[in-house]
A protein has these predicted regions:
Chain A
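H-loop (His-switch) and adjacent beta-strand-loop-beta switch element
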Residues: 214-231, 239
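The feature captures the beta-strand-to-loop junction immediately N-terminal to the Walker
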Residues: 60-62
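Pre-NBD coupling/linker segments of ABC/ABC-like ATPases
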Residues: 2-43, 233-246
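Helical segment within the ABC ATPase nucleotide-binding domain
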Residues: 184-197
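Conserved ABC ATPase "signature" region
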Residues: 25-32, 112, 124-141
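H-loop/switch region of ABC-family ATPase nucleotide-binding domains
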Residues: 205-206
């Protein structure tokens, strides 16, 4: 059964140079007749991709080649300019843990907040609080505001919340282990459980040997184009060959 | 079958939206009142102090416009201040709400409109517990009629509509123009001075008056004062005027927000 299908997906985005924008400058440029439409850049170029249930896919490529953007398209954060995206099942994004935390409020309130942001109901989250605190080893900090935790503890909490569920589709963007050594092992175990539990996994990684070991299929993106798709080993070889040519 | 699935989906979306609103509002309130024992009642301090100040400075001069009663001036200034304070708090908090949560919007799929709305909702809650009871008591003492107390809901509803509309508009504009807060501060000041809060509307020259009517808060303040202070039954024409201005501004704000929100993600 296919869970993700991208048909001819292209995405145009405003370029980074346009990031200085204010009312004063815009008005001035309109008065001077120098106003121009913001420039746009092609970030993803006609991507076709079908992912079946349970597949583990590694996405590789140079920085800025559109790997994270592709994940954002699949998660529904970005809408494609042309083409269509279809996704079946719940997606758990595991991107930069702790982005949804508010440092001022307590750990327990943050668990509810983050959980609801990730798409669970409050009632569901209330039942999970204990297991999350336990996994993150933060039982003693239940009512402490998050700004009172060390950065490692915050990362632990983020990981514990985001992985406390069994999602249909797991999206990993370069975060595989956080915290100290003993916690890293716990993380790895949990990730391995996802791997075994027939979840569909999409990983963006620069760790090529990890992709070769853990993923079945590989995708190589280059300047927004799908350069190669196939067996993980072949994809990594192809990518490395092109690097050696330079 | 397909229809029932669709119904189910929209119901799920509504429930998710509601849950999001719930956690975001409770987050806003918790952050705001953590560690202050007066809690919500801090929000009353500002209009009370300002009313005292205005009364001390202008009270004696303007009392003749208020039936020679300083008390009437106090009440008129207070009702006006309550409205303008609510407006400026709501809209300036909504302004930064979309940009402030930009990194979050880049990581998790969320309905963008929930952020400005959660700011408005937090202020509504604060108003309902803090200021509203005081207004209700004032109204009841003045009019001796429960109908007036109940009618207070309508100008307040109109106020919420106006604030939501402006909140959507400025939160969307802020994504494109990051120097907007400076301009918006000026706009709030213009609205503040052009609403007859601490001066009687009668002192404004005839030529200037039509411009003051453009102020979306004027009909609301007028209706609120009529209900709270006049002692006569609520004037329906004033209420309709206030609600109409609310609906127009909300429609305008929401339309802009809706049309522009597809461009947000490239700039956050």
């Amino acid at each position: 059964m296919e869970v993700i299908r991208l048909d001819n997906v292209s995405l145009w985005r405003r370029t980074q140079e346009e990031f200085s924008y204010d009312l004063k400058k815009t008005l001035l440029s309109v008065f001077e007749g120098k106003y121009r439409q913001p420039a746009k850049k092609l970030v993803l170029d006609k991507i076709n991709l079908v992912v079946k249930k349970g597949e583990k896919i590694g996405i590789i490529g140079a920085n800025g080649s559109g790997k994270s953007t592709l994940l954002k398209i699949i998660s529904g954060i970005l809408q494609p300019t042309t083409g269509s995206v279809r996704v079946r099942g719940q997606i758990a994004p595991l991107i930069e843990l702790g982005a949804g935390f508010d440092a001022e409020i307590s750990v327990i309130d943050n668990i509810l907040l983050y959980g609801v942001l990730l798409g669970f109901s409050r009632a569901e989250m209330q039942q999970r609080i204990q297991s999350i605190l336990e996994f993150a080893e933060l039982q003693d900090y239940t009512f402490v505001p998050v700004k009172g935790l060390s950065s490692g503890m915050v990362a632990r909490l983020g990981f514990a919340i985001a992985t406390d569920i069994q999602p249909d589709i797991l999206i990993l963007d370069e975060v595989l282990s956080v915290g100290d050594e003993s916690f890293k092992n716990k993380c790895k175990q949990r990730i391995d459980n996802f791997w075994d539990a027939n979840a569909t996994v999409l990983v963006v990684s620069h760790d090529l040997s990890f992709v070769q070991q853990s993923c079945v299929r590989g995708i190589w993106l280059d300047h927004g184009q799908l350069r190669f798709m196939g067996n993980a080993n072949e994809t990594v070889d192809c990518y490395l060959k092109s690097l050696n040519k330079l | 079958m397909i229809i029932s699935l669709k119904d189910n989906l929209t119901w799920l979306q509504v429930r998710r939206y509601w849950e999001l609103l719930h956690v975001l509002v409770s987050r806003n309130l918790k952050v705001r009142y953590r560690g202050s024992f007066l809690g919500v009642y801090w929000s009353l301090l500002n209009p009370l102090i300002m009313t005292g100040l205005y009364t001390a400075i202008f009270g004696a001069t303007f009392a003749s416009y208020y039936g020679n009663s300083i008390m009437n001036y106090v009440l008129a200034a207070f009702t006006g201040l309550v409205v303008i304070n609510f407006f400026s708090a709501c809209t300036s908090q909504a302004l930064s709400s979309v940009v402030g949560n930009g990194s979050l919007l880049n990581k998790i799929r969320l309905p963008v409109s929930v952020f400005p709305l959660s700011m408005i909702a937090a202020n509504v809650f604060q108003f309902a517990v803090g200021t509203f009871p005081l207004l209700a008591v004032m109204t009841f003492l003045n009019s001796k009629s429960l109908a007036n107390v109940l009618a207070l809901i309508f100008p307040f509803l109109a106020l919420v509509l106006v604030c939501t509309g402006i909140g959507f508009l400025v939160s969307a504009l802020y994504v494109f123009f990051r120097d907007l807060p400076y301009f918006y501060e000026l706009v709030v000041f213009v609205i503040w001075l052009s609403s007859p809060i601490f001066y009687p509307a009668a002192i404004v020259p005839k030529q200037v008056k039509p411009f003051l009517n453009l102020n979306p808060l004027s009909p609301i303040i007028e209706s609120l004062r009529q209900i709270t202070l006049s002692g006569s039954p609520p004037d329906l024409a004033l209420i309709w005027g206030a609600l109409l201005s609310g609906v127009i501004i909300l429609t305008l704000g929401w339309t802009c927000f809706h049309l522009w929100r597809h461009q947000f993600m490239d700039l956050l």
